[in-house]
A protein has these predicted regions:
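Glycine-centered beta-turn/loop sites at beta-strand termini
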Residues: 15-17, 24, 33-35, 42-44, ...
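Short glycine-aromatic motifs
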Residues: 12, 29-32, 73, 109, ...
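Leucine-rich solenoid repeat scaffolds
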Residues: 129-166
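All-beta strand scaffolds that present successive hydrophobic residues in beta-strands
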Residues: 17-19, 118, 138, 156-157
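Sec/Tat signal peptide C-region and signal peptidase I cleavage site
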Residues: 6-12
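Bacterial N-terminal signal peptides
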Residues: 1-4
Length: 166
């Protein structure tokens, strides 16, 4: 929502058990799918976008704020979870998820079960992919990245500079 003065207000979007499509406002939004195969996207501001069940597509959307972390999350189901050009916290949760960080300094967590695929994108990223039995695949992209992973289980690309096998 935008006031006449040009100030962007935050909005809350709360979905249904059915498939929903939400695109956030220019302000900082809280978007939650609540079931179904949702398509959810933030748009400016510092957003929190959550899939909450179903096979969801969740993204931070365009216009994030550099150095201020947005939070984008899947949930149960096989989700696609993507950050944006700013700093993001990306979480897939359970299910076989595809997670992409984007251009900023991102924190990506792929350790809640399932077989996850991570593309950290550019920027100096931190990827946590340990504490689950799934065989995760991690590509760090550009930047100086740090990865905590399950040794002997996860597949970590050569472009991941700092590795911490568990």
């Amino acid at each position: 929502m935008l006031l006449a003065s040009g100030v962007a207000l935050a909005a809350t979007f709360d979905g249904t058990p059915e498939p929903d499509t939400f695109v956030g406002s220019p302000g900082s939004d809280d978007i939650r799918g609540r079931g179904g195969g949702d398509n959810l996207s933030g748009a400016g501001g510092i957003d929190r976008v959550r899939g909450d069940g179903g096979n969801d597509s969740v993204s931070g959307g365009p216009g994030g704020i550099p150095d201020r972390r947005e939070r984008v999350e899947g949930d149960t189901g096989n989700d696609t979870v993507s950050g944006d050009e700013g700093a993001d916290e990306v979480r897939g949760h359970s299910g076989d998820d595809y997670m992409r960080g984007g251009d900023g300094a991102d924190f990506i967590r792929a350790d809640d079960g399932g077989i996850d695929t991570v593309n950290a994108g550019s920027g100096d990223d931190v990827v946590e992919a340990h504490e689950d039995a799934g065989k995760d695949t991690i590509d760090c992209g550009e930047g100086i990245d740090t990865v905590d992973f399950d040794a002997g289980v996860d597949v970590v690309a050569d472009n991941c500079e700092n590795r911490d096998p568990h």
